[in-house]
Amino acid sequence: MEIVYVYTKKRSEFGRQCNFSDRPAELHVDILPDESLLSNFIEKNPVDRGIQCVQEMSEHEINTERFETDSRGINHMEGGWPKDINPQEVEQVLRFRKKVEKDESYVTTIQNLASSMEHTIKQNNAIDIYEDYFADLEIEEVEETPSAKTINVFRDPNEIKRPATHLSWYPDGPKKLAVAYSSLEFQKTSAETSMDSYIWDIENPNKPEFVLKPVSPLVCLEYNPKDVHVLIGGCYNGQVAFWDTRKGSQAVEMSPVEHSHHDPVYKTIWLQSKTGTECFSASTDGQVLWWDMRKLGEPTEKLIMDPSKKGKMENAQGVISLEYEPTIPTKFMVGTEQGTIISCNRKAKTPPEKIVAIYKEHIGPVYSLQRNPFFPKNFLTVGDWTARIWSEDIRDSSIMWTKYHMSYLTDGCWSPVRPAVFFTTKMDGSLDVWDYLFKQKDPTLSLQVSDDALHSLRVQDQGRLIATGSNSGTTTLLELSSGLCTMQRNEKALVTAMFERETKREKILESRQRELRLKRQGASAQGQDDDEEGGPDEEEDLVAAAEKEFFQIVQADKKKFAAQQAKLSEQDNKIIEEAEENNGSEKKDTENGEKEG
């Protein structure tokens, strides 16, 4: 539509803007009634009227001041240390402190706070705030029978059940439990068997909270202690993968097949590092591989478990268990299929130097290996039909061990809160709780957890909850009684004395065996020298002397036997003569009696 004509008007002709204000009511028009019109109307009586007996309401709208809200979080680290500083690492702490103390703002702040801090310190020193008013009051110790109760049971949701091969607790409290499911029987899995593993909420056993979907069944699974959303898993085909629960069920990254293990990965452990992305894995192919999650293309380091220290794969022993203590970051230990425990040093320069010590006493695979959290020099191993406690100083034998059980032992671990308590699982589906301060020959508590064999075991860091996984895919969550998860009076000192006593005893036995071994070696060497000097004539003389000595011993035994027979015959003759005399005297007595009668 085209504009035909435009009307133009000046701004000054628009008039003023409206300006409203409050004022009282005014009467402008008042029309009075006209009585002449009254005849036009008729009064109606009665009149129908409708009324509503309710309170009158009206709708009003108001505009209030709007407040904008948003969600914010705060990340508190223990001790106020930065994320990349581990408070347990002495070198990192000292390095960080020196760096901060050189800062000018730090020095200025300390000088400004010195006066107020000094005043506060004087206030604290004026009164002993740590005074114990009831130091002499004896606490009544209530003897509680060791017990445990089942809290929840988590079952494999698939139709074809698989063993629960590994368990891992959520690092930030007893909230979740990650379970790896895999069948380790060779070529026994079908195409319909699921490869999924699950993360369970311990309050909801009906449905898994999260599903992990690997390309191969997971044999082991571990939470990252520094990032609760990240997990590392070892697959049945030898690959290593890690998941981030914020990014879905699929693995974020996997190691390539050509640079991975060639057998199932039985154990993966996170390393104590600044980045929190380093880990290492062990497999029955005889290799231990180190990885960095930021680059899984190939391992950062490799070690072949060859006890001969030659680094040959044909001599390597398959690794089933792996141990790493964060307080000793350079050391780790492995347990092999052949029953050998190998102690290693990662920081050694050459592969032979990395294998430090070898312990051998199990006659079957070492399924579990863990250091005591209170005494790192002592470690627990579980294999064949026994559980054994070792000392690093004694290599020939363990210092303590359990009796041989009727069922095969499958897993074991220490209590994180009591140095004298450890747990073991068996093929008959039972869980044994051992308290070495209470008794050492038998378990303190034995529970029949499942009708199927128990395969895995894990204790929560607070020591109250314990989870076990069975061959049927059932994970049972148990709660221990307070006596089993509360440190007893003087327990640490008593356990220290017990370990030292047993270590000293084994050292004495070891030195005695060494002396006997040297004597036997010396005697055998001397015998060989005599044989070489004497020749065949002396050998014939020795044989003749041995035969002569043998026949002399036989003749002496014959004479001794003949003397014993003669002595026995004499005794028999005496007994017969005495019996005949007694019979004769009895006959005479009877004849005399008849005559008198």
Curated annotation (Swiss-Prot):
Cited PROSITE patterns: WD_REPEATS_1 (PS00678), WD_REPEATS_REGION (PS50294)
Biased composition (Acidic residues): 528-542
Keywords annotated in UniProt: Cell projection, Cilium, Cytoplasm, Cytoskeleton, Dynein, Microtubule, Motor protein, Repeat, WD repeat
Compartments where located: Cytoplasm, Cytoskeleton, Cilium axoneme
GO molecular function: dynein heavy chain binding; dynein light chain binding
Repeat region (WD), residues: 159-210, 213-253, 260-301, 314-354, 361-400, 404-444, 449-488
Keyword Repeat (UniProt): yes
GO biological process: cilium movement; outer dynein arm assembly
Highest rank taxon of the organism: Eukaryota
Covalent S-S links between cysteines: none
Chain intervals for the UniProt region annotation (Disordered): 512-546, 562-597
Basic and acidic residues composition-biased segments: 584-597
Record InterPro entries: Dynein_IC, WD40/YVTN_repeat-like_dom_sf, WD40_repeat_dom_sf, WD40_rpt
SMART domains: WD40
Gene3D superfamilies: YVTN repeat-like/Quinoprotein amine dehydrogenase (2.130.10.10)
Any one GO cellular component localisation term in the record: outer dynein arm
Function: May play a role in the regulation of dynein heavy chain activity.
Family membership: Belongs to the dynein intermediate chain family.
Quaternary structure (record): Consists of at least two heavy chains (alpha and beta), three intermediate chains and several light chains.
Protein name in UniProt: Dynein intermediate chain 3, ciliary
Organism: Heliocidaris crassispina (Sea urchin)
